[in-house]
């Protein structure tokens, strides 16, 4: 499986959909597949081949699957889920103790380094975080960030969905089962959505689509 792919890109200041992101995507999942194959071959030698694997020199019929990991990603620190982009860099969650901020760990590090985040009890920090929440987790309207930072820190609804599908297609050859691929579409017409689905349908490496999240908001710009 895999989790926090987008978080990894954010930690390394890599723009989703860039050539570098494609190199990382290829290297990451080809390495996982290589290690998994070596492991199942070793297990077959040590424990023997199951009846359905006789003659293939492996212990497993399937090796890799990418689950959504939505709950797990939240529990381990609000990292990005599975192979999907981060929906927002700040949001609020109601708990028995009251309302708390959930902040993407990469974004938290950035705003701490820039001196924007002082503490969660600080009035200026709270105003900043609530402003991000009010913009669906987007930072594109904030003057504290450079254009390069804004390019890296785009939410799922601001990332070009075709770039997302291209990464899905690229890694599928290393994944045994279909990926849990979510689509995040902002301000798209029915015709544009149909065109996107056709793009996915005609790609032999895109085996399924999971959830389709739609958003109508004039403040959200997809790049």
Language-model-detected regions and their locations in the chain:
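Conserved alpha/beta enzyme-core scaffolds, especially Rossmann-like or related mixed alpha/beta domains
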Residues: 1-4, 9-27, 152-155, 171-188
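A generic alpha-helix surface/boundary motif
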Residues: 3, 38, 105-106
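Internal maturation/activation junctions in enzymes
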Residues: 9-69, 148, 180, 196
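Catalytic alpha/beta core of large soluble enzyme barrels
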Residues: 64-223
């Amino acid at each position: 499986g895999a989790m926090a792919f987008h978080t990894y890109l954010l930690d390394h200041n890599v723009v989703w959909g860039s050539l570098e992101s494609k190199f990382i995507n290829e290297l990451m999942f080809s390495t996982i597949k290589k290690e998994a194959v070596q492991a199942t071959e070793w297990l077959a030698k040590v424990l023997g081949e199951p009846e359905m694997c006789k003659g293939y020199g492996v212990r497993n019929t399937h090796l890799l699957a990418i689950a959504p990991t939505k709950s797990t990603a939240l529990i381990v620190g609000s990292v990005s889920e599975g192979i999907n982009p981060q929906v927002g860099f700040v949001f609020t969650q109601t708990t028995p103790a009251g309302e708390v901020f959930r902040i993407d760990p990469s974004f938290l590090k950035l705003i701490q380094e820039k001196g924007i985040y002082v503490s969660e009890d600080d009035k200026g920090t709270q105003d900043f975080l609530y402003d991000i929440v009010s913009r669906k987790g987007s930072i594109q309207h904030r003057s504290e960030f450079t254009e390069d930072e804004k390019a890296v820190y785009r939410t799922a609804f601001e990332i070009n969905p075709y770039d997302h599908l291209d990464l899905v297609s690229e890694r599928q050859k290393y994944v045994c089962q279909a990926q849990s691929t979510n689509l995040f579409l902002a301000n798209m017409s029915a015709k544009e959505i149909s065109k996107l689905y056709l793009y996915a349908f005609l790609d032999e490496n895109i085996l399924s689509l999971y959830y389709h999240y739609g958003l109508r908001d004039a403040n959200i710009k997809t790049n």
